[in-house]
Regions:
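A composition-driven surface/loop motif
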Residues: 2-141
């Protein structure tokens, strides 16, 4: 859903879609062209500030980080039995991380509306792939 405004458009999408738009804008950040670059910078700022709380929520706990590093020893040694035992011993921390990631995924699936700068089709980079365009199409006119 797009409503034209003075600044740009109100774009309604899931937070996951906004994350993909943000990633695509960053992938194309070095593209030449002032109009496109301006839209990239402005839209990236708006989307990043909107997604920051989700990113913060996704950060693993210190306990999980330490376990993850220790688990790498079992993985590198290809010690499946040892890894399984290790995971069982620390199931509380692992379950907490799974719960945390479920909450993050739930947040990413929520719908939001952001005011973004429209990118005129004439200002799109020549080397933009179909996949990248598909991601950005909500902000292209």
């Amino acid at each position: 859903m797009i409503n034209a405004e003075k600044y740009g458009v109100h774009v309604t999408a899931t937070n996951r879609e906004f994350l993909n738009i943000f990633k695509t804008l960053n992938e194309t950040r070095s593209t030449k062209g002032v109009a496109y670059a301006k839209a990239v910078v402005k839209n990236s700022e708006v989307i990043k500030s909107h997604l920051d709380p989700i990113e913060e929520k996704a950060k693993p706990s210190e306990a999980f980080m330490l376990l993850s590093m220790e688990a790498q020893k079992y993985i590198q040694a290809e010690d499946g039995e040892g890894l399984k035992k290790f995971e069982e011993e620390h199931s509380d921390v692992i379950e907490e991380r799974k719960k945390q990631m479920d909450e993050v995924n739930s947040m990413l699936d929520q719908t939001s509306t952001l005011e973004l700068k429209v990118i005129n089709e004439a200002h799109l980079p020549e080397d933009l792939s179909a996949e990248q365009l598909e991601t950005l199409i909500k902000i292209v006119n």
